């Protein structure tokens, strides 16, 4: 009897253990699995161009380094599982490189991108960046000199791309507003010489067609939007997320691009400002516009033109007599400062040389008035609402969420970071900074003494008062951004340079418009 009881207990124990093991096995098999990423991240541009989409988002830490930026291994871990990742034994291409040269109005920049193409979509592994001055447009009629000015940048590209990859690494040169304003004849000669120099003296295959060209302002803005939102992880990440608006301020033009949202019974008005984009399996309807002639350097010239025209009206300057140098007071300079030898271009054949000097007392509000004036807010608005110059723009207040980011970069960054503004600030803080700078040296010491390098920056560049007032006018008066709205700025995100170049480089991973060079030029 005792033995039978032991046997029954033993059988019960074995049964319980077996049931427990089965339960654990069932729970294990029901555990959620890592899902595969979308297979077809593509950008559809209006002219049918298929652009490989971005990889899984790079981490969102913002690193502000020196002008030379190198990003290492930020995204490779994101695509190692799921159907999007090709096995290394199946993939024979390995890494691909793209060389993109940004020929801007004030300088040229090279970006060398390295992608792991054994993932779908390709993974951005590395970026090498460097810039130099002056820009191609400064060479005017010296087309050969303009082409050779790119040699230091191309040497950096040669060093960044392995020797055995160079003959299959496409290169493109995209010029922006500065070259556009030289006129068709001069700019065409410069671009032709640049293409010739690349084809004859470097091993990189030059992209056919518009590989060496002046980029359309529409493309410039949209590619900048793609770059910023890709690096922020807002696009190409699977699910559709809110996107950031971008405001890019160059030397010759400025771009605005954002994704407005409308009530169900409304939609964006059709027109050249409307840009339909497909990226990472999601559709985006963007508002974009490139305001040619409203980059920082052109803004300076417009404000100084107002002062020269007043001087012509009063007889201080004799119209048409451009051989001499004139002396004028400017409210856009701090007291006690001068800006000598400034070239004020009224027209192609009417360029005055002026020594500007600051007033006896600060005149920042008068400078702001001039900055507002050149925006032509009173221009006829055929399709309301409008930003400036009669250009239609959906209201950022009513169609863009307050919780979504507004990113301002390029000259916005260059004029705020040396003076101590953080990477996130309100438009009111930018306006206060402009007022402080315009007040002059008497207040600079107490405000900027603790910010390394700021006093020397202000001393060597007297135009910061003008520049900051122009930026405040552009954002507040022009784009109607409230003073309390928070702005974000950056030069890089995860060590990758902001701007249009990354977005424009993605199509070049496909060789539809270029082919490897058979004979290498080393």
Curated annotation (Swiss-Prot):
Signal peptide residue numbers: none
MF annotations from Gene Ontology: GDP phosphatase activity; ribonucleoside triphosphate phosphatase activity; UDP phosphatase activity
Pathway connected to this protein: Protein modification; protein glycosylation
Basic and acidic residues bias locations: 65-75
Function of the molecule: After transfer of sugars to endogenous macromolecular acceptors, the enzyme converts nucleoside diphosphates to nucleoside monophosphates which in turn exit the Golgi lumen in a coupled antiporter reaction, allowing entry of additional nucleotide sugar from the cytosol.
Record-given protein name: Guanosine-diphosphatase
Family label: Belongs to the GDA1/CD39 NTPase family.
Main localisation: Golgi
Entry's transmembrane regions: 7-26
Organism: Kluyveromyces lactis (strain ATCC 8585 / CBS 2359 / DSM 70799 / NBRC 1267 / NRRL Y-1140 / WM37) (Yeast)
Name of the encoding gene: GDA1
Active site residues per record: 220
Catalytic activity line of the entry: GDP + H2O = GMP + phosphate + H(+)
């Amino acid at each position: 009897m005792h033995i039978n009881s032991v046997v029954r207990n033993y059988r019960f124990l074995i049964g319980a253990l077996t049931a427990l093991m089965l339960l654990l096995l069932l729970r294990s098999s029901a555990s959620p699995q890592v899902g595969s990423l979308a297979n077809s991240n593509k950008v559809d541009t209006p002219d049918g161009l298929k652009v490989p989409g971005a990889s899984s988002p790079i981490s969102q830490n913002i690193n502000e380094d020196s002008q030379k930026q190198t990003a290492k291994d930020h995204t490779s871990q994101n695509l190692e599982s799921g159907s999007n990742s090709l096995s290394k034994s199946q993939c024979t291409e390995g890494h691909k490189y793209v060389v993109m040269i940004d020929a801007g109005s004030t300088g040229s920049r090279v970006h060398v991108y390295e992608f792991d193409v054994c993932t779908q979509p390709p993974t951005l592994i590395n970026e090498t960046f460097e810039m130099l001055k002056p820009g191609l447009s400064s060479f005017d009629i010296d087309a050969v000199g303009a082409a050779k000015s790119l040699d230091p940048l191309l040497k950096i590209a040669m060093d960044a791309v392995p020797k055995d990859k160079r003959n299959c690494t496409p290169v493109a040169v995209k010029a922006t507003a500065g070259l556009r304003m030289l006129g068709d004849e001069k700019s065409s000669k410069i671009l032709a010489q640049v293409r010739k120099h690349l084809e004859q003296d470097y091993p990189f295959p030059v992209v056919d067609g518009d590989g060496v060209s002046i980029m359309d302002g529409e493309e410039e803005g949209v590619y900048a939007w793609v770059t910023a939102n890709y690096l922020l992880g807002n696009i190409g990440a699977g699910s559709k997320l809110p996107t950031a608006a971008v405001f890019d301020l160059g030397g010759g033009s400025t771009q605005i691009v954002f994704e407005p949202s409308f009530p169900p019974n409304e939609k964006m008005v059709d027109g050249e400002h409307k840009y339909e984009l497909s990226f990472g399996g999601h559709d985006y309807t963007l508002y974009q516009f490139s305001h040619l002639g409203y980059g920082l350097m052109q803004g300076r010239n417009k404000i100084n033109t107002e002062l020269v025209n007043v001087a012509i009206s009063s007889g201080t300057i004799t119209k048409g007599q451009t051989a001499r140098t004139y002396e004028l007071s400017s409210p856009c300079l701090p007291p006690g400062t001068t800006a000598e030898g400034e070239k004020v271009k009224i027209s192609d054949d009417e360029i005055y040389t002026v020594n500007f000097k600051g007033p006896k007392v600060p005149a920042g509000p008068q400078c702001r008035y001039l900055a507002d004036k050149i925006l032509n807010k009173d221009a006829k608005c055929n399709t309301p609402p409008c930003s400036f110059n009669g250009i239609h723009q959906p209201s950022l207040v009513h169609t863009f969420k307050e919780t979504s980011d507004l990113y301002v970069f390029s000259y916005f960054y260059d004029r705020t970071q040396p003076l101590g503004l953080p990477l996130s600030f309100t438009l009111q803080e930018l306006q206060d900074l402009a007022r402080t700078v315009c007040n002059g040296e008497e207040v600079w010491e107490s405000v900027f003494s603790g910010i390394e390098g700021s006093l020397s920056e202000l001393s060597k560049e007297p135009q910061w008062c003008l520049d900051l007032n122009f930026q405040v006018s552009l954002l507040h008066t022009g784009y109607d951004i409230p003073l309390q709205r928070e702005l974000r700025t950056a030069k890089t995100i995860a060590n990758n340079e902001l701007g249009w170049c990354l977005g424009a480089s993605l199509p070049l991973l496909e060789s539809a418009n270029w082919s490897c060079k058979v004979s290498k030029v080393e």
